[in-house]
From Swiss-Prot:
One of the Pfam families matching this protein, by short name: PEP_mutase
Record text on cofactor binding: Binds 1 Mg(2+) ion per subunit.
Residues that hold Mg(2+) according to the record: D85
Organism: Rhodopseudomonas palustris (strain BisA53)
Keywords assigned by UniProt, alphabetized: Decarboxylase, Lyase, Magnesium, Metal-binding
Name of the protein in its database record: Oxaloacetate decarboxylase
Protein family membership: Belongs to the isocitrate lyase/PEP mutase superfamily. Oxaloacetate decarboxylase family.
Length: 289
């Protein structure tokens, strides 16, 4: 697979002048839908990965192997660049190296490495951060492990919601100095916070869950925010649709009584049925009806 074009597309977003909303994607079908609808980039969040792969909440139970396998399936299904939430890199700095290598091979356009202490330690009721020195070590390891220089590596900090704005800026500046391609912040709620972050750094910014108070897209673009992640509604919508459909079937509804189902034309489109038909005809001499 030629992943470099996708990585170049993500880099173009980060070096551009506007703020884009990524599609929250989690499997091959959601990747294809997002690609068909014209999204510029997909975001494969950690919480979504846990739901899609394990059916569990986001408590750091997923393994690197499971994540990489899903990213590979998604990357093969559509040409959409996908930015992968690689959580804490699945261990220490040496584990981070392996994480980068596996996700790069799986076709990720980019990935984020964060400084949250994961999994949550015994007896801790609130999220904690690793030390700045350990965070720098992880970022250095990630950059060193990158085989394709076009792979986007983003340093992520959760300090704003856990410690302070000053700490978030200090960590971001350290990751910037290490050589990351962009900075990812969670917990940004106000314009003064974002103004301070933008003034103290020079790299493109990715925001996770920005508050409504700052989601003016022109303002975000002026502050170098190039990607703003606004939750993961698609998997929640899909879960409700499956629940309601199965509930109706369990209550005795006949197939013709079910509503909200994808039309045959849509199913043909998202499964790339026309491509499969052509290949069956060409290689097997079969006509699929």
């Amino acid at each position: 697979m030629a992943w470099r074009n996708r990585r170049g597309a993500l880099r173009a977003i980060l070096s551009g002048s506007h703020c884009t909303r990524p599609a929250s994607v989690y499997d091959p079908i959601s990747m294809r839908i997002a690609d068909d609808l014209g999204f510029e980039v997909g975001m494969f969040g950690g919480s979504v990965a846990s739901l899609a792969i394990l059916g569990d909440p986001d408590i750091a139970l997923i393994t690197l192997t499971e994540l990489a396998e899903q990213v590979r399936r998604m990357s093969r299904a559509a040409a959409l660049p996908v930015l992968v939430d690689a959580d804490h890199g699945y261990g220490n700095a040496l584990n981070v190296r392996r994480t980068v290598q596996e996700l790069e091979a799986a076709g990720a356009a980019g990935l984020t490495i964060e400084d949250t202490l994961l999994p949550q330690a015994f007896g801790e009721t609130q999220p904690q951060l690793i030390s700045l020195a350990e965070g720098q070590g992880k970022i250095n390891a990630a950059l060193d492990a990158r085989g394709d220089p076009s792979l986007v590596i983003i340093g992520r900090t959760g300090a704003l919601a856990i410690t302070s704005l000053d700490d978030a800026i200090e960590r971001a500046q350290a990751y910037q100095a290490a050589g990351v391609d962009a900075l990812f912040f969670t917990g940004v709620k106000t314009r003064p916070q974002l103004d301070a972050i933008a003034a103290a750094t020079t790299l493109p910014i990715v925001l996770g869950g920005p508050s409504e108070a700052i989601t003016d897209w022109d303002y975000l673009a002026e502050r170098r925010v190039r990607i703003a992640v606004q939750g993961h509604a698609p998997i929640a919508a899909a879960t409700r649709a499956v629940f309601e459909t199965l509930q109706a079937v369990r209550n005795g509804a006949a197939p013709k009584q079910l509503s909200g189902l994808a039309a045959a034309e849509l199913m043909q489109r998202v499964t790339r049925g026309d491509v499969v038909d052509e290949r069956c005809d060409h290689f097997l001499g079969l006509k699929r009806s």
